[in-house]
Amino acid sequence: MLTSILIKGRTPVLASRNLLAALSNCNHITWAVSRRLYNDGNRDQRNFGRNQRNNNSNRYRNSRFNSRPRTRSREDDDEVHFDKTTFSKLIHVPKEDNSKEVTLDSLLEEGVLDKEIHKAITRMEFPGLTPVQQKTIKPILSSEDHDVIARAKTGTGKTFAFLIPIFQHLINTKFDSQYMVKAVIVAPTRDLALQIEAEVKKIHDMNYGLKKYACVSLVGGTDFRAAMNKMNKLRPNIVIATPGRLIDVLEKYSNKFFRFVDYKVLDEADRLLEIGFRDDLETISGILNEKNSKSADNIKTLLFSATLDDKVQKLANNIMNKKECLFLDTVDKNEPEAHERIDQSVVISEKFANSIFAAVEHIKKQIKERDSNYKAIIFAPTVKFTSFLCSILKNEFKKDLPILEFHGKITQNKRTSLVKRFKKDESGILVCTDVGARGMDFPNVHEVLQIGVPSELANYIHRIGRTARSGKEGSSVLFICKDELPFVRELEDAKNIVIAKQEKYEPSEEIKSEVLEAVTEEPEDISDIVISLISSYRSCIKEYRFSERRILPEIASTYGVLLNDPQLKIPVSRRFLDKLGLSRSPIGKAMFEIRDYSSRDGNNKSYDYDDDSEISFRGNKNYNNRSQNRDYDDEPFRRSNNNRRSFSRSNDKNNYSSRNSNIY
């Protein structure tokens, strides 16, 4: 049978199955079979230079919705379909073949684990290996001739599922290249990378004999020279890094530290791709393979991901070196994706602003019932709204328990300090954006509260996954207005998550007065906060099937409610309204009061919101992550002309060519 294929994304040719099989064994970076089925025009020709990695010009920009992934059905999420034309070496391990109960003791008896790592993990007094750990540790260590892809829910112990095999490998090779990096772990965010480093230190603390296998984190927002001094001093065997900083180090010091890498781990691979790191990950893999002293295909790759869509599969095919790749699926298709131990509920108000009152009243009740022994995380849609909520909660509850603000605009040192503090505290409230939604492991969180909807459907699952960790129970409360109810239906349709507990809420005059007294922001600041929310929600309209004419005016009405005058509208200039594409829309007139001036209160702050402001709309995935001032991988910000936020209008009225950094 003849099959049409593409070599290096160029001219189609006809080939037999034998030729296809031969091509599949070629170097994946050099030969790309059927690559153009998934990629944009010029991405097939790889180049390790940064200019090529930053080339993102061929992405579609005509509609803000073109770049948004379609909502997947429940059947799509349950059954992972691999395209054999691009991933022919995959071996799908049936769940029934990998369902035998595994314990640390059994792994020790079988000779899979050394007594030193067994001692360290046992001293942590875990109740037992989690299902993810049971299904992955032994297959990872059983052979050096295959890579591994593992699909697992959030909060299921993925970190130790790859740390235990890494330490076992270091023990097995302790006399080989003792002072070289042997394992590289790539994480999507600084905070997750530092958290993985903290887990490594726990293993060190439980068995001092393992401290000789040193670990160093390489993340943005920290001093590069200090990190290199630490690398020279410790000569680590394990490096945990974010992609941008890792590439910086590899380009300068790959020969010095990274010639003996045996393991490469991608944690939260789907999130890495979601943020825009695909080219960086392929570059990292290419450099590590090229510099490896043993062979270009020596490195074993472990890829952990909550979802395995076409993009994740494509990445796996491009970066995995071994002849075989095991796929281990630890997700039961009969279970919903949200953790089964989480008690979920939704509180529905008439107005968006009432969700703020409802959340404050709920927290007051919990503090009273728990005698101030209350630990919760509150998620908010944008940075400005997060800061606003934190201010209100501090004015309300600072005498009862600590209130912490956490988002990407905070410096890395402060973020690290906040994470350590909240992990240690028995009580407190962490107010954050989605930067804290994935991978962060905070112990003993009683509740996750959400005011408004997340930027993406999957983030609801990752948000609530911050509670009910390590076998404990927890609860989640979603505070929304009636116009946000389509989000709840979308959760049920697309993710099989049914929130049975639903209650309506109407604030009393007492709680409204109490909260409004805690509002200290000026009207201009309130308008900025509400406009950031409008930006957020406008980007979600199509995905969640919101009614634009209802949801946007409802969000805008929050301005008047917070200023204790429901009739007030947000004052903006006509020029600003033009930028939003709403100057002739009835919706714009319902939301804003047009004032023809460009400055206020005698200062330089303008209602026009110039191009360097943070009012571009969120949700556009067509951005180049390496050139943005981002809150994930965090090398020092390099401003360039293409980094300016553009309000270019299209027929869709919502086409913005850069991503809103205000949401994280």
Swiss-Prot record:
Binding site for ATP: 152-159
Transit peptide: 1-26
Localization annotation: Mitochondrion matrix
Domain Helicase C-terminal stretches: 355-512
GO biological process, one term: transcription elongation by mitochondrial RNA polymerase
Compositional bias segments (type: Low complexity): 48-68, 639-649
Span(s) of short sequence motif DEAD box: 267-270
Class of the enzyme per the UniProt entry, highest EC level: hydrolase
An MF annotation (GO) of this entry: G-quadruplex RNA binding
Biased amino acid composition, Polar residues: 653-664
Chief localisation class: mitochondrion
EC nos: 3.6.4.13
Additional remark text: Present with 10300 molecules/cell in log phase SD medium.
UniProt similarity note: Belongs to the DEAD box helicase family. DDX18/HAS1 subfamily.
This protein's domain notes: The Q motif is unique to and characteristic of the DEAD box family of RNA helicases and controls ATP binding and hydrolysis.
Name of this protein: ATP-dependent RNA helicase MSS116, mitochondrial
Organism encoding this protein: Saccharomyces cerevisiae (strain ATCC 204508 / S288c)
Primary gene name: MSS116
